[in-house]
């Protein structure tokens, strides 16, 4: 090598290092920047959304609820209001608002469906007045699909009407405690922002019914309150569980090195002062989420359900955790601690032998931050329940546990009932929806992934449970359970086939994938809710169906899995799952520096020019021209591949793909960390558009226009930065320059953008409030319809033949809207 060439190479190397440092600095600066639109903005934006709904020219056109009537969604909390003549039950949906039942869970109606957030963290009834109900919005249970709230709400008329009572920027609420005799005294445990640091976390108190609040317990911007309990005999004594955490896009929330503020605090003067309790509890740097409860029969006894991150037993060689990451040691996992002296000292009760130690370690697998609640039997201080992947009970103060739902008589035959739901009502036993419609289902299990439990202080046989499969009631001490028919399913995606009538496909959190027939032959208004049937795919999947053969179903997702199913005879027999399913995931290539990684909802599309051609996104873009039999890798790692942002949760991956319907091989690819690339020659060469983007945000949707070759749309999200501004753009020069088409949209995050399949002037988009339509290319937006609940619309499709928009909500199932009026040029 000559000196001249060496000098050039050295200069090039210096330039590369400098540019890399600049990019890292820019990304870090952007990641630390405060959100452009926080939760306070969101509350005001929702008021704008309501005003837009009232003024919408389409307010009198209704959505029809399609279902599913047989799949419920995640319940974050349960509560009971006892009236002289009856008992009222409440179920707080993670994402579908608050539901109410006056017949012990037989029928339900929504009572919190038009507020600034449909994400429920906690629901509490004032002990002194059953008409006073408090709701804390924003779920403390951190999921792939947990959403920020908008503060606390109060009802004084049994949940008929609601008033926003502040604390909007807390974003997640773990617990609300109301004074036993003075309903104006209320405490709120706020866990704070999910993704970023903030000071609106800790324990808050009001003495005037929520008109004003005082922060009475606060540690730092990373530490929030996740649980709060009050001594049943001394209302001045409270215990708070504090959790110091950070959540990153590439890692779930765990206690970081140097985090020492997680623990249990106690106040004996109604929250004015607090003292940390340490005698016997694990040190703060090992503590994760903590759940608390007090024995009502003996308030000296306090239990702490602890997620302990300390190193436990050595793992066998090549052991992987549930994320597929190699580990050397198991974490200690869940533990039960008991205090017999009101928190002065603590004794570890669980894991007394190897069998029980293993039981506790597996109780929450490796994600204890999702669970973390314990309940003490109101009559027996030694009987406790812990809520995790399952529900487990101990009758010896936590020394030994057994799983519930493994004993008891055969389940009784359920009585057919109908939920009282506006826009979602069917007749009892209605045949049009198939078996199991709107009926409670008997089971011997309390459900999986458990978050809430209520134990009747007067009747040891009556129990309520809230979990990922919905709301359940037991009237025999937990031997058998009845799953309530609350239509609150949490969909991630939506796809359609071209059969007649057509079907829609979607995946549901913690349930799997489902499909249903959409029969609009008598009009959308005449549609009835239906039960959905199982379909190919998992709980986090995207779908695509061959437009020439509705039996060929592709499903991708769950961190990069992808399959092709030929339903064949199974579909003809009315069974959505069956036939043959083939794993068609691309294989790693020799020399790959990293393992293949895909998002929770790894994107996959069929080419609009050839149904045998698929595009699939991991950290690379792949294309198959033979229905997934073979693949070619079209790009290098287009996400940037920053090693510092590679963790147990796949990140820096492709999240959206679009091929132009006008030009074969004109392909756009967007990533979760804000990279965008385009190819105009079928993937031979790529142009990086990243530095031309207005924002470096999660690219929820990139859409190549079907009307103008150079036009492309993009919806970006700030959700994972706790940012609720609108990022919606249009380019008319293949992505070189961008113009905002946010117009009068009230707030984000925007989940989707679509063109009308007939009218080039019409666009549709959606966010956490609903669906919007523009008839002038995005200059002005209107709320679509007047009766859709205020809920996160994750995805929607527009059927090109049947002129309907089908929306997949995360909390209220699937809804259908007639868009034929927009389809005249």
Say what each PLM segment does.
Residues 1-10:
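N-terminal secretory signal peptides that target proteins for export/translocation
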Residues 4-5, 19, 543:
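Absolute N-terminal positional cue centered near the fourth residue
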Residues 9-13, 589:
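Short N-terminal leader segment in a subset of presequences, especially plant chloroplast
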Residues 14-25:
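Bacterial N-terminal signal peptides
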Residues 27-30:
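Sec/Tat signal peptide C-region and signal peptidase I cleavage site
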Residues 32-825:
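Beta-propeller blade termini and top-face loops
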């Amino acid at each position: 090598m000559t000196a001249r060439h060496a000098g050039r190479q050295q200069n090039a190397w210096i330039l590369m290092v400098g540019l890399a440092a600049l990019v890292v600095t820019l990304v870090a600066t952007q990641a630390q920047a405060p959100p452009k639109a926080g939760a306070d903005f969101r509350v005001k934006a929702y008021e704008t959304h309501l005003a837009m709904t009232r003024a919408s020219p389409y307010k009198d056109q209704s959505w029809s609820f399609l279902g599913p009537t047989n799949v419920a969604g995640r319940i974050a909390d349960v509560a009971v209001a006892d009236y002289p003549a009856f008992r009222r039950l409440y179920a707080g949906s993670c994402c579908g608002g608050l539901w109410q039942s006056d017949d012990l869970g037989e029928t339900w109606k929504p009572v919190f469906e038009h507020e600034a957030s449909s994400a429920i963290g906690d629901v509490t009834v004032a002990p002194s007045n059953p008409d006073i109900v408090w709701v804390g919005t924003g779920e403390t249970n951190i999921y792939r699909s947990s959403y920020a709230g908008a503060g606390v709400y109060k009802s004084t008329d049994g949940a008929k009407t609601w008033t926003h009572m502040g604390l909007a920027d807390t974003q997640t609420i773990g617990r609300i405690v109301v004074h036993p005799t003075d309903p104006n005294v209320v405490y709120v445990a706020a866990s704070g922002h999910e993704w970023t640091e903030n000071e609106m976390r800790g324990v808050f108190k009001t003495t005037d019914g929520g008109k004003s609040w005082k922060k009475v317990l606060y540690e730092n911007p990373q530490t929030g309150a996740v649980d709060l309990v009050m001594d049943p005999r001394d209302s001045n004594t409270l215990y708070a569980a504090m959790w110091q955490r950070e959540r990153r896009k590439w890692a779930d929330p765990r206690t970081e090195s140097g985090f020492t503020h997680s623990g249990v605090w106690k106040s004996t003067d109604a929250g004015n002062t607090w003292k940390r309790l340490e005698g016997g509890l694990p040190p703060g740097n090992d503590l994760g989420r903590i759940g608390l409860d007090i024995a009502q029969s003996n308030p000296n006894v306090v239990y702490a359900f602890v997620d302990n991150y300390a190193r436990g037993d050595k793992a066998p060689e090549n052991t992987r955790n549930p994320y597929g990451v190699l580990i050397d040691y198991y974490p200690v996992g869940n533990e039960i601690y008991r205090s017999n002296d009101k928190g002065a000292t603590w004794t570890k009760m669980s894991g007394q032998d190897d069998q029980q130690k293993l039981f506790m370690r597996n109780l929450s697998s490796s994600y204890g931050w999702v669970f973390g609640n314990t309940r003490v039997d109101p009559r027996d201080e030694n009987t406790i329940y812990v809520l995790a992947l399952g529900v487990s009970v101990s009758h010896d103060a936590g020394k030994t546990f057994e799983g519930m739902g493994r004993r008891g008589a055969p389940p009784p035959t359920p009585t057919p009932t109908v939920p009282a739901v506006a826009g979602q009502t069917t007749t009892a036993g209605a045949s049009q929806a198939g078996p199991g419609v709107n009926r409670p289902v008997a089971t011997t299990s309390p459900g999986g992934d458990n978050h809430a439990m209520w134990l009747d202080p007067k009747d040891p046989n009556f129990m309520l449970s809230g979990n990922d499969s919905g709301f359940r009631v037991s009237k025999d001490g937990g031997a058998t359970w009845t799953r309530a028919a609350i239509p609150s399913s949490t969909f991630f995606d939506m796809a359609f086939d071209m059969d007649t009538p057509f079907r829609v496909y979607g995946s549901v959190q913690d349930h799997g994938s489902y499909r249903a027939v959409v029969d609009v032959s008598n009009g959308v208004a005449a549609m009835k809710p239906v039960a959905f049937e199982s379909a190919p795919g998992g709980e986090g999947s995207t779908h695509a169906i061959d437009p020439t053969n509705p039996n060929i179903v592709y499903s991708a997702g769950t961190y990069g899995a992808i399959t092709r199913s030929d339903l064949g005879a199974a579909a003809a027999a009315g069974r959505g799952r069956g036939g043959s399913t083939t794993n068609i995931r691309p294989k790693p290539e020799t020399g790959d520096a990293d393992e293949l990684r895909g998002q929770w909802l790894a994107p996959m599309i069929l080419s609009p020019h050839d149904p045998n051609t698929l595009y699939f996104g991991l950290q690379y873009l792949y294309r198959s021209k033979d229905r997934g039999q073979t693949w070619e890798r079209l790009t290098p790692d287009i996400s940037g591949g920053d090693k510092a942002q590679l963790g147990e949760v796949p990140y820096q991956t492709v999240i959206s793909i679009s091929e132009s319907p006008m030009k074969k091989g004109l392909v756009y690819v967007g990533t979760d960390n804000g990279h965008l690339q385009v190819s105009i020659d079928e993937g031979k060469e790529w142009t990086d558009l990243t530095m031309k983007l207005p924002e470096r945000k999660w690219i929820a949707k990139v859409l190549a226009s079907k009307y103008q070759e150079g036009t492309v749309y993009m919806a970006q999200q700030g959700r994972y930065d706790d940012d609720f501004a609108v990022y919606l753009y249009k380019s008319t020069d293949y992505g070189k320059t961008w113009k905002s088409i946010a117009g009068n949209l009230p707030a984000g995050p925007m989940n989707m953008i679509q063109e009308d399949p007939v009218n080039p002037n019409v666009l549709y988009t959606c966010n956490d409030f609903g669906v919007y339509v523009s008839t002038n290319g995005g200059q002005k937006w209107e709320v679509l319809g007047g009766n859709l609940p205020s809920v996160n619309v994750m995805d929607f499709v527009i059927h090109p033949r049947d002129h309907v928009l089908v929306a997949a909500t995360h909390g209220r199932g699937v809804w259908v809207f007639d868009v034929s009026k927009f389809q005249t040029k």
